[in-house]
């Protein structure tokens, strides 16, 4: 049985731990902070054998060197082949190596190229779990630091086509702020209203809203629904000079991202 556990880091990051019971060897996804990972390993008598990286930002990679030293340079470190990240031992690209396996973990991992947040961002799928870094958030998506709106929309559409039951393990607890924006653009979405209430209740108990699911994100995430009639109407109302424009999905997505950046 594959168990996935969150380690909290910084203000809102999640570092994901993958463990196939009954093994005590584990992998971590996007360890921006080595100290919290080491504390978790030692508290649970686990051995770190590998790291999975989604992109180059320091809050996702900052702990790699220290973890390598802690593990006496015995780690396998997977990450995107076209981003400059120190410590990667196994560079990955979905076209060249769409699938691979991990020691101590059952089943194959699928690699997805999901540029947008960064130029070389990748995601991982194993069984019913998606590790998508800063591409897809619950109720939102990542800022476009290096990619184009077209790239990000294509990446999100690729993720949205995964099976509905797929659990979404993103890297940040941004859900409440994302849902506040989502409700501003899609206020009559009953599924969104219900989810917002559940998310508020979880956060009041200091519980994570993650993982989400692909099914839920299809229903409530405005960045997966940029052509929805109400969302298009909200965009045109917000950008009043476009009130008579014909917006395709890319145009709507581009304006949604611009709106969210200044929300």
Swiss-Prot record:
The organism's place on the tree of life at top rank: Bacteria
Keywords: Hydrolase, Metal-binding, Zinc
Cofactor note: Binds 2 Zn(2+) ions per subunit.
Sequence positions that bind Zn(2+) 2: 59-60, 134, 172
Pfam families associated with the record: HAGH_C, Lactamase_B
CDD domains reported in the protein's UniProt record: hydroxyacylglutathione_hydrolase_MBL-fold
An annotated GO BP: methylglyoxal catabolic process to D-lactate via S-lactoyl-glutathione
Pathway: Secondary metabolite metabolism; methylglyoxal degradation; (R)-lactate from methylglyoxal: step 2/2
Cofactor requirements of the protein: Zn(2+)
A GO MF term: hydroxyacylglutathione hydrolase activity
Catalytic activity: an S-(2-hydroxyacyl)glutathione + H2O = a 2-hydroxy carboxylate + glutathione + H(+)
Binding site for Zn(2+) 1: 55, 57, 117, 134
EC number: 3.1.2.6
NCBIfam families: GSH_gloB
Similarity comment: Belongs to the metallo-beta-lactamase superfamily. Glyoxalase II family.
PANTHER family the UniProt entry points to: HYDROXYACYLGLUTATHIONE HYDROLASE, HYDROXYACYLGLUTATHIONE HYDROLASE GLOB
Subunit record text: Monomer.
Role according to the record: Thiolesterase that catalyzes the hydrolysis of S-D-lactoyl-glutathione to form glutathione and D-lactic acid.
Protein name: Hydroxyacylglutathione hydrolase
